[in-house]
């Protein structure tokens, strides 16, 4: 009985925390599903305070951070890199908690002006946006090095990640795939999801949902001209190339941080040693896995790479054909659906 009571108390505290987690959303249900035609719908994830889907994962992460810090009477430094939407969503999520100081590295260059202002105009003493030379990958390398060093931390401080390497981010994103399926057909038949991606976190959330029982037919991994994921699913070629600037900058990434999770779970049967060995010489050497193992991709994944010209064309097509405006990232996913006939 004591165990049951304790568990009930934990669940109650979790429910209370979750009830107060997602704030400042313009949509009552947080998410809106818009039917484009009989076979295609758009899952609108832009109704949060920064108009980024990452509001879902990062507001949940910030709530967990704050609860833990309150319990342990500690403070934390949030250290992250951004190609646009991660930084603004992280800053907005963490700015409410005095125990958290946010240091976000911003690459100088290809970023929308509104996202830059979302990060650099927050009037809070615990927010520190840092403009850095180089690309998002360069910023992310600095963050990874910071997590190795940790010498700058005080004794009562934690160092926390807000990029999608943080598992709580993925948890927050798994939820809306179940929501979409429940609202679409009450889980009665498998769905296809086309997901625009760079770092693979949102795709991995969709994959994780399938592992939890969500009926899925295919996950379409939709990328822009930075096509490392497309090359892997198409040709078993996971090799790093220079970043190409596009009109979908949140996906301008040369290496997908969350891909290692898929490799470990889907292809390598959770063999951590084999996974570590494969990554030991990357990115100097491309990752090419055993051909028989790689063939498993066809069970669940499709991929397509969309350049800027096709992105513009798809945005125009959706406006003219459906009177529906989509942003460049959504257009990448939409074009993948059109070309793959899914």
Positions of predicted regions on the chain:
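Single conserved hydrophobic/aromatic residue that forms the stacking wall/gate
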Residues: 1-7, 11
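Anion-binding (especially nucleotide phosphate/pyrophosphate-binding) glycine-rich loop
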Residues: 9, 15-46
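Well-ordered mid-protein domain cores that form the structural environment of catalytic cofactors
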Residues: 41-96
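A glycine- and small-aliphatic-rich helix-loop capping segment at beta-alpha/alpha-beta transitions
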Residues: 59-70, 93-103, 119-123, 210-216, ...
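A short, small-residue-rich loop immediately preceding and capping a beta-strand
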Residues: 72-90, 102-104, 189-199, 219
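Short internal beta-strands
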Residues: 103-109, 130-131, 217-224
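Active-site/ligand-binding loops adjacent to catalytic centers
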Residues: 115-165, 225-328, 332, 336-337
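Domain-scale recognition of functional cores that engage charged ligands
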Residues: 141-145, 150-210, 214
